[in-house]
Amino acid sequence: SCVRSGRAATRIKELLERTGLEKTVMLTRMTGDVCRLDYNPLKPAGAEENHNARREVLTFLRRAGLEISGESLTGPFAGAITHFHSADFRQEGGPYSAYTPVPLVPMVLHGKVTYAADVDRRYGECLSILYGCTCSEEWTAATPLRHITDRFYLVALPWSRLAAKPMLAWRRSDTTQTIIFGESDYVQADLERESYRVVVGGYTIARDCVTTCPVGRRRMAVYSKYGAPLRLKLPPGWPETGEIRALLLREDGQHEEQRLKSRDGHLEMEAPEGRPIILSA
């Protein structure tokens, strides 16, 4: 085979020299078809041999210092590759669409790999947060900044607070699903109502397109997809009553500063549509 003869290592070395690849590479055809066969009569190869050879190629690339991501999430390559750009978690139209969706694959792979998925857009941010399909999209120069900002503050930031916690249980009651990460850490979503809630340490960090996520000691990111008046219960450690500094971030990288007042552990403020705010005390 190419691996045993040393040709694979030579080709990879040539590839790196000619392309200048560094840091990372995405392989589009490496992982999708697990049971690939080679019917070449001169050098036939079965599924196991083919799979093992591909894993050797991945080893060569890692030794060259490259972080590898794959296209399609498949079990045999989970771990050999740590990020996949496509996982099939369709709610309708898939091979199991007649059955009740259960987040079995996310619970098995959570903490081992990251992945994205083409989720049903009818469910907004709910499904991405519930199943952890939060980790990649294809953005180009034509991608609206507002879309990127929505994805970061509404999905990626809240999920980052759960990514390192183990998935412990899944529960369903009527149309509401809950994934439990700890005694006071969970995601709860009702897909039909496009309603969700993310709770970490007993504190709600995201709810129905509004994010109120602590990002450090006495610092919080606030973001509203549609704009809304908010009455926030401040996290533990914040002053019950006092001055709160609010930085309204702008597209040009600058900010506008406001001074707000907290009272009795709560803060009333107006969150503008699609405008990140950083609070500090």
Model-derived features: positions:
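Active-site-proximal substrate-binding groove within the catalytic cores of carbohydrate-active enzymes
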Residues: 2-22, 31-276
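Short helix- or helix-capping micro-motifs
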Residues: 28
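Short beta-strand-to-coil "C-cap" segments at the C-terminal boundary of structured domains/repeats
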Residues: 279-281
